[in-house]
């Protein structure tokens, strides 16, 4: 009896995934790249050749792309340590809502190799990139002024500098000069 119940559980998650891919007409190859797995893995999940993933990272990535909560998958176990969603992630999600962009539309705007990184940013597992070009690409895709995302990039860089031993109180002049220069660059190149 337990085996029958397990197959119903697998079928439900597999069906959810299959229905999502059909509804959005998202190619399985694109989906695989977005969540950082192989195409054969996606086919195996849908065909139930393998059990649906119980790995929280994979389930969170799948849920992020599907715009659902990972808890909707019965296989998902809530992690002991809660995932903290930072202000930047919330900012990006708000902009997606304002622009009426789905997660899939947003992800398709990025190069294929970068999509799984963006999924990790949206699920709160990765901060925005320190590479300004990558961060400014997010602003371009969201069609917002780069100054709006710059604030989040600056906060991320300050946090990294502090964690690396930079004392902003003792080096306020240098810190102010660094970020004044960066702000000027962003304003001139917007």
Regions flagged by a language model, labelled:
Residues 26, 37, 68, 101, ...:
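The short coil/loop that forms the "turn" connecting the two helices of the helix-turn-helix
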Residues 67-83, 140-160:
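Short C-terminal boundary/hinge segments that cap the last helix of small helical domains
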Residues 36-53, 76-78, 112-128:
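Recognition helix of helix-turn-helix/homeodomain-like DNA-binding domains
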Residues 49-64, 125-140:
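Short, basic-rich loop-to-helix N-cap that marks the start of a DNA-contacting helix
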Residues 46-47, 58, 66, 74-77, ...:
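DNA major-groove recognition helix of helix-turn-helix
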Residues 29, 40, 71, 116, ...:
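Key DNA-contact positions within bacterial/archaeal DNA-binding proteins
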Residues 83-109, 140, 153-190:
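Interfacial/linker helices and their anchor residues that mediate assembly or domain coupling
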Residues 1-27, 78-105, 157:
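A short, Lys/Arg-rich alpha-helix, primarily the initiator
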């Amino acid at each position: 009896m337990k085996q029958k119940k397990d197959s119903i559980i697998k079928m439900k998650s597999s069906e959810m995934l299959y229905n999502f891919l059909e509804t959005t007409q998202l190619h399985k190859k694109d989906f695989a790249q977005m969540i950082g797995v192989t195409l054969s893995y996606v086919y195996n999940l849908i065909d139930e050749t393998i059990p649906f993933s119980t790995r929280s990272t994979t389930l969170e990535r799948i849920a992020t792309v599907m715009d659902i909560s990972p808890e909707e998958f019965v296989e998902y176990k809530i992690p002991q340590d809660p995932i903290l969603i930072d202000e930047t992630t919330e900012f990006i999600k708000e902009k997606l809502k304002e622009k009426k962009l789905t997660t899939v539309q947003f992800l398709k705007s990025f190069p294929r190799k970068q999509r799984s990184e963006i999924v990790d940013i949206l699920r709160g597992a990765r901060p925005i990139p320190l590479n300004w070009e990558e961060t400014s690409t997010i602003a371009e895709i969201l069609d917002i002024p780069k100054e709006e995302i710059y604030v989040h990039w600056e906060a991320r860089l300050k946090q990294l500098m502090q964690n690396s031993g930079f004392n902003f109180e003792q080096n306020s002049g240098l810190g102010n000069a660094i970020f004044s220069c960066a702000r000027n660059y962003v304003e001139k190149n917007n």
